[in-house]
Amino acid sequence: MFCRKYAFQTWKQFSRFYSAVNNIRASKTRNIGIIAHIDAGKTTTTERMIYYSGKIKRIGNVDEGDTVTDYLPSERERGITIQSAAITLPWNQHKINIIDTPGHADFTFEVIRSLRVLDGAVTILDAVAGVEAQTEKVWKQASSLNLPKIVYVNKMDRPGAGFSRTVQEVIQKLETRVVLCNLPYFETNKESDLEFKGVIDVIHQKLLKWNEMDANGNEISVVDIDKTTPELLQILEKSRESMVETLGEYDERIIDSFLEHDENYLKIPPILLDQVIRKATIDNYLTPVFCGASFRNIGVQPLMDGITKYLPSPLETSLPEITKNGKEVPKKADDEKGLVVANDNNLTLALAFKVMTHSTRGPMTFVRVYSGKLNAASNLINTRTGKKLLIRKLLVMHGDSPEEVKSISAGNIGVIPGYETDFQTGDTLVSSAVAKRNFTAKDSAYRLLPIDIPPPLFNAAIEPHTAGDEAYMKQCVETLIREDPSLKVHLDEEMGQVVLSGMGELHLDIVRERLVNDMKAKVNLKDVVVSYKESYVGKKEKEAVITDEEIEVVVTLSHTEDARDYIGQEGALVIEGDNNVILLSQTALSEHVQATIDERRWKCENNLEELKEAILNGCLTALQMGGPILGFPLHSTLVTVKRWNAPVEQAQEQALNLMNASRQAVQSLKNEEKDFSILEPIMSIKVYVDSNDLGEVSHDLTQRCKAMIVEIQDQSTQNLETAAWAKDEATKVYVPPDYTIKKNVSKFDDIANKKIIVAETPLREMIGYLSKLRALTQGRATFDMTLIGMRRAVGNRVDSIVEEYKF
């Protein structure tokens, strides 16, 4: 049997290569995300990838809290990834930009804004747990953006690991075709138990075994699979047959090659298989599957090969939506220059997808450059503010360690350091390769597709220890909001508290920890509560008129079911997060103001658009100031500005007067509690539970959580019963037997014994539910929930909410 060492480059070779990594062209660049359920091994796998690329000399450990990508103290303490860390590394003459994203549901916004700037994703699954709830959620998010994906089945060394079972779940739950690029390889130890030792490379027909004596996983023996290894050869033949049949349905070249090689599945050239798998992956026709055990350093290098071979470059993905003055801009992909926008080779467009403040380095803005080249010591313009800025430095990130670069080319991710208040998440940045370009108003008209921010669901109040601590507390809160746009803040004037609103309990717990432990803010922290709303439910439209000398504003208040109906309507300001609309009627302009415009007697220091914006802002402020019951922000409310007037023929500033008048007008309409109701968030939840625990968990949901059970599904067949395609596909794919599960049949529950409870419940009842669920099921159950919408609270629900908030 021929055996040789796998030819990996040394750390020194990679270090020399890295000095030129920033010059690698776009076609050799891969922007990928690491996404999965919490504890599937995302950060551990990323740490191995960094090590094998030569970026670090020692492998970090999540349990010991010394990994590169989890560098916040709260991340290292909890062993989870909270902020997505960006890192650039070299591999096989390619450049891989990795965004390590969170796996906890509370940090979904981090995942969303990371996916927006990626070209592909690696989905990591726990071979014992299979496809978990958060995995399905993030997979759907990635699919909605048409991101090509590969799957890595991790933790194959664990008792109860089931590679084949997990692959079947991928097909059934994630509804995707698969090709198995490698398979797990086991050997029997002295105790007659199976141990995971390596992988079978289906494409190249090799057995890759990792040397147990090499603690870092660098030494890999590569053995040809042939007649001398009959058991492996049989598995390989079946796997090749399944792969060829799947690929043959996509690309006729596979069928032609199969016929040319005497209908022998093993003789089809690996290079052709790689080409077709790549094309099919980029087309989202199928998903390549790899396996390994990252903690034991097995299987990571083939995964890295798969990233460079199968995931797309920035030139091969869907071109980003770019508008100018609301109209689509022409764009094309160029192999040398990357994306070219508006036929201007010098035009640089970048998206600020993340803003954070480092404890020692200060503000850092993460950007994805879409076209051109962003140069250090050059000017750019922020199209949101219209402000021109000189960019002195540019960085690429190695976890928490920056490396200064002269430029960031199209398709790459980097960092702009400094500029504390100049950037926000979602900003479009315009620059030029021409150093002395003069920016114009036309440059400020460019927009890259903005990032949608989901509405927060939980609140937590904070108070300074003393009046002297208030200023620093506010400064810290402002910093956190710039970093995390899914975090909101408002002042409860009645209680004198600053209220933070976030996506979940853990989200707000981390925010509070950062305030106290990282920022050393002296604050008192209140318990997490649900974010309620109030809504106008009066049967008739209410009208108010505010007059003050020559200032006049007339507004009406009514209920709206769906604010999105007003999107695109002239004069409408739609606040989707709160389902509110402020509508400036087309006939709202008074005859006096219209005559002043027609007769060109306008002397007001504000122009017409500024006055309209002031009126809208005044109405918006009133909505956010809350309703008459408990002061919750208004929801599902339509404010219509019927008429307004101001002495615009006078040389005075009128914007503030109109803003105050419109705010007072809306406030005056919120004087009767009987016209308003409290709304509470209603969640759709899925509880993943063993059959043995089904009764007790269902009873707890209906009695304690006030839930309405919609249905109970069989986890193993939920998609097979509803998707004939998935059933057919699952039977076509060859997967080897899960010998490890057979060995542990007495220790581990069969997946067929799993149930899914689908229910609807008020969010208030789900606070602390995970710990209660684990106590009920000895830690075996998990759950996932999504917001259905806001629903009117009635009866005892109103009483409990009032009791909770009135002191």
Swiss-Prot record:
Signal peptide: none
GO molecular function, one term: GTPase activity
Entry GO CC: mitochondrion
tr-type G domain boundaries: 27-315
GO BP annotations listed: mitochondrial translation; ribosome disassembly
Record bears the keyword Repeat: no
Keyword hit for Mitochondrion: yes
Localization in the cell: Mitochondrion
Record-listed GTP binding positions: 36-43, 100-104, 154-157
Alphabetical list of InterPro entries matching this protein: EF-G-like_DII (IPR053905), EFG2 (IPR030851), EFG_II (IPR041095), EFG_III (IPR009022), EFG_III/V (IPR035647), EFG_V (IPR035649), EFG_V-like (IPR000640), G_TR_CS (IPR031157)
A Pfam family: EF-G_D2
Alphabetic keyword roster: GTP-binding, Mitochondrion, Nucleotide-binding, Protein biosynthesis, Transit peptide
Role of this protein: Mitochondrial GTPase that mediates the disassembly of ribosomes from messenger RNA at the termination of mitochondrial protein biosynthesis. Not involved in the GTP-dependent ribosomal translocation step during translation elongation.
UniProt record similarity statement: Belongs to the TRAFAC class translation factor GTPase superfamily. Classic translation factor GTPase family. EF-G/EF-2 subfamily.
Name this polypeptide is given: Ribosome-releasing factor 2, mitochondrial
Organism the protein comes from: Candida dubliniensis (strain CD36 / ATCC MYA-646 / CBS 7987 / NCPF 3949 / NRRL Y-17841)
